[in-house]
Amino acid sequence: MVSQTEWLGYCLCKPGAWQDEPGEGDVVAKVGDKIFAFLGDGSAIGLKCGDREAADLLLDRYRGAASKTAYIGQHGWNTFTLDGTIPPDEMRDLIDTSYRLIVAKLPKSKRPA
């Protein structure tokens, strides 16, 4: 099973990515000024999955290991457990998608080179 620290390291290897702690115990990965991964307490990771329809397809695919993210789920964010249920290569794909979606929303001047 991959640890939260290892997933955070994977997130931070992305161009322009950096770690922030906007609240006590809240660990997030950002690109520019936008969050692309919520790592929280290490038991789960919140990721942008596209529009709500795309996010709902992932809820069906990972039933029991994924849920709509509180407060922002209606905007296409899901939370995925980090208990090993989701294979590491698929989790990397989910992180890559979240990063790519967030970078696409950044103004061109703030996008990583």
Question: For the regions a protein language model found, what residue spans apply to each?
Answer:
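Charge-dense, helix-prone N-terminal extensions
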Residues: 1-113
